[in-house]
Amino acid sequence: MPGFLVRILPLLLPLLLLGPTRGLRNATRRVFEIAYSQDRFLKDGQPFRYISGSIHYSRVPRFYWKDRLLKMKMAGLNTIQTYVPWNFHEPWPGQYQFSEDHDVEYFLRLAHELGLLVILRPGPYICAEWEMGGLPAWLLEKEAILLRSSDPDYLAAVDKWLGVLLPKMKPLLYQNGGPIITVQVENEYGSYFACDFDYLRFLQKRFHHHLGDDVVLFTTDGAHETFLQCGALQGLYTTVDFGPGSNITDAFQIQRKCEPKGPLINSEFYTGWLDHWGQPHSTIKTEVVASSLYDILARGASVNLYMFIGGTNFAYWNGANSPYAAQPTSYDYDAPLSEAGDLTEKYFALRNVIQKFEKVPEGPIPPSTPKFAYGKVSLEKLKTVGAALDILCPSGPIKSLYPLTFIQVKQYYGFVLYRTTLPQDCSNSTPLSSPFNGVHDRAYVAVDGIPQGVLERNRVITLNITGKTGATLDLLVENMGRVNYGAYINDFKGLVSNLTLDSNILTGWTIFPLDTEDAVRSHLGGWEHRDSGRHDEAWAHSSSNYTLPAFYVGNFSIPSGIPDLPQDTFIQFPGWTKGQVWINGFNLGRYWPARGPQLTLFVPQHILMTSAPNTITVLELERAPCSSDGPELCAVEFVDRPVIGSSQIYDHLSKPVEQRLMAPPPKKTKIRGWSMYDDESL
């Protein structure tokens, strides 16, 4: 062996043993930092500003992560921003999900492979129009817990969760060879009433403990002094958020009051806006968004476009606002990429703005995915919920003198059936009431199998019913999504207070927590063989124009002889009212064409099969189109175009803060971190 190799080998051996990635990192240290004196970021010593877009991996199937990320890169973005919803990964205490659609590490590595940097927003609270703002519902088992505070019960749960999540993130930090350049602590905390600096300091210490002292930690709050009073903390870099039409100079001056030096940052520049059931679909004009983006970039600021792709609130993951208004299944957000990942006019307009400031990648942009209209599919009614309780609640019911909440029976999402008997004769219409607005969120009411109507949070708290003494009173209660923003995120579900019948409190409840997911995946297929056809009990209906909540099932096959199938599609519900839909056991989410604005649900191709028929399961809660007195068929239809609502341009984003606070619609005017209610009721 040559002499110089003998001398140098002991020096090289430690690097060789570290492997290629770690060895390179030690040989050439990667650094991402704030250069306060230069009012900018430095990446490996060079000036840097990010142009980022928000994508929530929890709202996009893993099957499509690469497609969406590539489209974001080709738009000229150099960074993506994503939330980590705690409840998406720990839906039950101590039971963690980090595989398949929950594999956040894979998602971040994929972004890295595509040359995208990452802004990580791990909460623990995220808002995001997501169920309970990303906090797990099981936290409410401590009924007096004060969320987002230094409450010991809350801190203990947060500490345990961060101890699971953040060590997974540390190898993915930029300085460790990964894509994560900055990490947000909490989320718009200045908009929350608690104003608990001990809580923020606790988070700051735990983030540094798990991620190291050289990680860039930041906060985000609305561009108003009020929010920064409780949202900013020394040692966490303060950023602001605001939408198109805002006064950019004023907004960044607010940031400068907390951060006299350092980069200007808009962490949430709104490309669109959120929706609620029963309100028009929100859009913001492309030219308004493009013009404001140009002005932000012209100031040398870093910016994140919220959202660049919205995606879908599959299953039960949508959130809600106060006064109670649930968000729909679609989180399209009028973003540059549609819910289905399609290129829009806004995409190309914003790309044109970005390329005036930064070089955009050359080459073809991945096209919009093809869609296919599979047509109508007939569905057969199987059983009502009441007739299927042995399958839906295999462990049996819970007895209680007074009604229990979802949390008390450990049912965090979905449905619970509450049953008691009428203690008096109600041959004449008798008021069934929730005097303290205690139905959270909708209750489908029946007496001896005869539907009576619906009780609904904030909207319908009294319903006249009829029945004889001793008749069975059923209330199927639906959790429509927990409040994700504001003071009322301690959102208990079910019957959260007593019901009265003609002013008398009802007692003696039998409570059935329903495992609809397991039933749909494992058992529904067997129902058809055991008990097919229409059921007289199931089809009972009254003058209230409701039918009993029931399951419907149908099958369809992907056409043969057509290349490149299956393809994405959209399912619509002509004549149906409100419910939940599954395809091949995959919970697509809620449909509610009777209220809108969303009429179709996105169906990604990866859940469809070509080797066997595809099974559609519908749980209709109010009224199906094929009731016993009508000629209509029970059918759904697959179409190749989405219908998520009529276009409605809300002008509340372009008004001064003082005007925005009072301007409907929506009734809750929220500038992400700024909210004013005309009614603070639950």
Curated annotation (Swiss-Prot):
Molecular functions (GO terms)? beta-galactosidase activity
Q: Does the keyword Disulfide bond apply?
A: yes
**Gene Ontology CC terms:** lysosome
Q: Which segments are removed on maturation as propeptide?
A: 24-28
Q: Which residues bind substrate?
A: 83, 129, 187, 333
Active site (record annotation): 188, 268
- EC number(s) per entry: 3.2.1.23
Record's signal peptide:
1-23
* Keyword Iron among UniProt keywords: no
- In terms of superkingdom, the source organism counts as Eukaryota
Substrates-to-products reaction catalysed: Hydrolysis of terminal non-reducing beta-D-galactose residues in beta-D-galactosides
Q: Which residues are glycosylated?
A: 26, 247, 464, 498, 545, 555
Q: What is its main location?
A: other
Q: What subcellular compartments does it reside in?
A: Lysosome
Disulfide bond residue pairs: 195-230, 626-634
Which top EC class applies here? hydrolase
| Entry keyword set | Disulfide bond, Glycoprotein, Glycosidase, Hydrolase, Lysosome, Signal, Zymogen
Query: What family is this?
Result: Belongs to the glycosyl hydrolase 35 family.
Assembly and oligomerization = Homodimer. May form higher multimers.
Its recorded name reads: Beta-galactosidase
Organism name: Macaca fascicularis
Q: Which gene encodes it?
A: GLB1
